[in-house]
Curated annotation (Swiss-Prot):
<keyword id="KW-0238">DNA-binding</keyword>
<dbReference type="InterPro" id="IPR036775">
    <property type="entry name" value="DNA_pol_Y-fam_lit_finger_sf"/>
</dbReference>
<dbReference type="Pfam" id="PF21999">
    <property type="entry name" value="IMS_HHH_1"/>
</dbReference>
<keyword id="KW-0515">Mutator protein</keyword>
<feature type="active site">
    <location>
        <position position="104"/>
    </location>
</feature>
<dbReference type="GO" id="GO:0000287">
    <property type="term" value="F:magnesium ion binding"/>
</dbReference>
<dbReference type="InterPro" id="IPR001126">
    <property type="entry name" value="UmuC"/>
</dbReference>
<keyword id="KW-0235">DNA replication</keyword>
<dbReference type="InterPro" id="IPR053848">
    <property type="entry name" value="IMS_HHH_1"/>
</dbReference>
<dbReference type="GO" id="GO:0003690">
    <property type="term" value="F:double-stranded DNA binding"/>
</dbReference>
<dbReference type="GO" id="GO:0000731">
    <property type="term" value="P:DNA synthesis involved in DNA repair"/>
</dbReference>
<dbReference type="GO" id="GO:0005737">
    <property type="term" value="C:cytoplasm"/>
</dbReference>
<keyword id="KW-0963">Cytoplasm</keyword>
<dbReference type="InterPro" id="IPR043128">
    <property type="entry name" value="Rev_trsase/Diguanyl_cyclase"/>
</dbReference>
<dbReference type="Pfam" id="PF11799">
    <property type="entry name" value="IMS_C"/>
</dbReference>
<keyword id="KW-0548">Nucleotidyltransferase</keyword>
<keyword id="KW-0234">DNA repair</keyword>
């Protein structure tokens, strides 16, 4: 039986919420993101996109392109509230929902006794009625094609890609439209004269494997309409991280290390909450020329406390020869494994106390409606 996969993608989500909440912004270029000189665009309205503005663009550049635009800070809590409304609608249709981000998801409706197009129209109507927002929906028999379809007629689009349309419908597309081909891979392909999917279809599988390794097989299949990836209702957490764009470029390692200490606490809290260990710690920097560099270290035993993560991250940065000024610093952990209490050593029993204390603090704060119980590091930050 051919699967029936739906890809749901909200249109300019953050900016659309701002326009919905503030009617005076409707029809005007709205740009949401970090408002400092070093901030970047999170998203922008379709009116702003006409000026060449796009996500991840430095905010100062967006202001140059559209000085008359409405520039707004990110209201994460508000966007999460709206996202919850939307996902409640999706889960009401099927339990087989894979959240991709705050504003994007896949649904497997193979066993829903309803035409996929009717389901798509229902989603669009219910989201519009509940939030006032538009959503683009793609329908196909696998995830790659469903996502491609949702992007076809944005905003407020609805597109179906059937088996008999492939590969013809894909041929004119740039190679960057193929899942698994980013800008760097596209550059590699352009260097050998391959710019479109039609060009790519002419390459034998062996050549794609030479270029991309195992991913070459997946790319070979996808451009022929084959993608066996399931809709994952419980997505595996592969990494946890935190990063920050600095107010001012710096080479000051002490300042950067202080940020890593703060990030270690945030990452540790998330590991404990998810009941996970990690073995690999990665430090990321973005230099003044926007080049991204990462260095990782894998330790012998699984760790999860902030002091352990911090020591590894600090060691990585101390050995790093910084030749350029740094504009962004980040920390992430990976190589994760579930916590198993029965395997904890005597010293590790502190984890149980931390989890219990953390959960109790969360519950009290939740019931009171305020964050009255804080960590020592939070109190120090508040007093600065």
């Amino acid at each position: 039986m051919k699967r029936k996969i739906i890809h749901v993608d909200m249109d300019a989500f953050f900016a659309s919420i701002e326009q919905q909440d503030n009617p005076e912004y409707r029809g005007k270029p709205v740009i949401v993101g970090g408002l400092s000189g070093r901030g970047v665009v999170s998203t922008c309205s379709y009116e702003a996109r006409k000026y060449g503005i796009h996500s991840a663009m430095p905010m100062y550049m967006a202001k140059k392109l559209c000085p008359q635009g409405i520039f707004l800070p990110v209201r994460r809590k508000r966007y999460e509230e709206v996202s919850e409304q939307i996902f409640r609608i999706l889960y009401d249709i099927t339990p087989f929902v894979e959240p991709v981000s705050i504003d994007e998801a896949y649904l497997d409706v193979t066993h829903v006794d309803k035409n996929p197009e009717d389901i798509a129209l229902e989603i669009k109507k219910r989201v519009k009625d509940a939030t006032g927002l538009t959503v683009s929906v793609g329908i196909s028999y696998n995830k790659f094609l469903a996502k491609l379809a949702s992007d076809w007629n944005k905003p407020d689009g609805l597109m179906v890609i059937t088996e008999d349309m492939v590969p013809e419908i894909l041929k004119p597309l740039p190679v960057t439209k193929v899942h698994g081909i980013g800008e760097k891979s596209a550059e590699k392909l352009r260097s050998i004269g391959i710019e479109t999917v039609e060009d790519l279809l002419k390459l034998p599988q062996e050549n794609l494997i030479e270029l991309f390794g195992k991913t070459g097989v997946e790319i070979y299949n996808r451009i022929r309409g084959i993608d066996e990836r399931p809709v994952e209702t419980m997505r595996e957490i592969k990494s946890i991280g935190k990063e920050k764009t600095l107010e001012k470029d710096t080479k000051n390692k002490e300042l950067l290390i202080q940020h890593l200490k703060e990030f270690s606490e945030i990452v540790s809290e998330e590991l404990i909450k998810e009941r996970l260990y990690c073995r690999t710690v990665t430090v990321k920097i973005k230099t003044a020329d926007f080049a991204v560099h990462t260095k990782s270290k894998t330790v012998d035993k699984y760790i999860r406390f902030s002091e352990d993560i911090y020591e590894v991250a600090k060691g990585i940065l101390e050995e790093w020869k910084l030749e350029q000024y740094v504009r962004l610093i980040g920390l992430s952990v990976s190589n994760l494994s579930p916590v198993k209490y029965e395997q904890l050593s005597f010293l590790d029993k502190r984890l149980v106390k931390v989890i219990k204390a953390g959960n109790l603090a969360e519950e009290i704060n939740k019931r009171i409606g305020k964050k009255i119980i804080k960590k020592g590091s939070e109190l120090l930050k508040d007093n600065k």
